[in-house]
Amino acid sequence: MRIRRLPESLIRKIAAGEVIHNPSFVVKELVENSLDAQANRVVVEVENGGKNLVRVSDNGTGMTKEEVLVAIEPHTTSKIESEEDLRRIRTYGFRGEALASIVQVSRTRIVTKTKEDALATQVLITGGKVEEISETHRDTGTTVEVKDLFFNLPVRRKSLKSSSIELRMCREMFERFALVKNNVDFTFISDGKIIHSFPATSDLFERALLILEDLRKGYITFEEELSDLKIKGIVSAREITRPNRTGEYFYVNERFVISEELHEVLMKVYDLPKRRYPIAVLFIETDPEKLDINIHPSKIVVRFLEEEKVKEALEEVLTKNLARKWYRSVTYEEISSRALSVAEPSSYRWFLVKKKYAVVETEDALFFIDLHALHERVIYEEILAKRVWRSKNLKRRVITSLPDEKLEKLEKLGFSFQFEGESLVVRKVPEFLTEDAVEEFFKEIIHGSTEMLREKIALAACKLATRSGEFDEKTASKLVDLYFQKKYERCPHGRPVSFRISYEDLDRFFER
């Protein structure tokens, strides 16, 4: 057979196969485009594990008609113009391959609108060929609908996994973005059912506690800066492990990466038995010019130009924070009733469901409230505000050194001190603090960290809250009123307090 040049259409199909391996990679590329378009709300919908449909909708900047027609061509991007831009890249996409690859191997519908345009542009593409361009209506943003992935590559189509496996991979890909982009409202829908709904939050670690539920059994959070590196994370206590690496998430400059080097550091510090792995969500921020992310089309492989420096910094941060010993044992009285005493009877129309949920009707939406989660948050805020904690005598002698302002604050929390000569001796501590944890606690206080103290307050609130299924009308009414006064979104552990559905969304669901 003679050597010949391949047709352009075949070249594009082959290239598409290198970027798009399965439906989860469609999710990845489209969500990255949404985030690069400055969206703060992203909805991912899949059908049949993404094999029949992947739809990603956002409220980003959108595209003009001219831009969308350019965007579906290979090696077109708004992210970079030169090699200098590539070295400093901060966006998710930059290769100009994603959308062009997707449209080559699917039936694609793109609807997009900029805030300047009166109407949206709709483009229908089949196997890379533009079939129709029209105008339609939608708010500013973009929806990309990808149907029948690999319909024109039957062998590739047949090689896709079962719908349940493909769904799991799509969900895991979605969760990778939800973990790092806490300021974005994320929704994941499978076959018409909402699987995840994450309202935007200012707390970076809330999502981790929702997605990685076993973290709630024991975790440590930290945020440190070493030289030109910033390292933040939420990691499991040593005794909380998994039999695999499914709880391991590394982010470099907000990009999810797979790194054996970082994994080795994690395992070295934890020093766990064979076939046991920690749960860890780690965020590393560094100068983009000290990274090479253009190694693989998927962009999930990264090379640090100063690898040893990064590894040493991560090891130092993990070692220091895992050395902290905190134990959870708290009992309080009267706080629960006092926390609710500030609320007036609710003026909203609402009703109690199963003695654990409140369904509330407002002018523009229905709210479904988890009363136990809300009660936890109310008590948590009350404890933070009032600082009413019982004390217990400390059996062993602990000497510390504190400035006057911290000494006064701690005394209000239930600590008691006594000067013996020039030494400051701790006599009493709040009930929640165990003997073993006292010295480490004071090290934290001296250096300004209160994170673990807040964690204990949250756990105390959990024990004080009325149990799910045991709420009466009076307590529920006060909680509903407090919800609309305070606008609480999460319980202290990070679980959602409420779910909101607008009447517009309700009409859309019933196809009105």
UniProtKB/Swiss-Prot annotation:
UniProt-listed GO biological process terms: mismatch repair
Keywords for this protein: DNA damage, DNA repair
Example of a GO MF term: mismatched DNA binding
One Pfam assignment: DNA_mis_repair
PANTHER family: DNA MISMATCH REPAIR PROTEIN MLH, PMS, MUTL (PTHR10073), DNA MISMATCH REPAIR PROTEIN MLH1 (PTHR10073:SF12)
NCBIfam families assigned to the protein according to its UniProt record, in alphabetical order: mutl (TIGR00585)
Family to which the UniProt record says this protein belongs: Belongs to the DNA mismatch repair MutL/HexB family.
Name used for this protein in its record: DNA mismatch repair protein MutL
Gene name tied to this protein: mutL
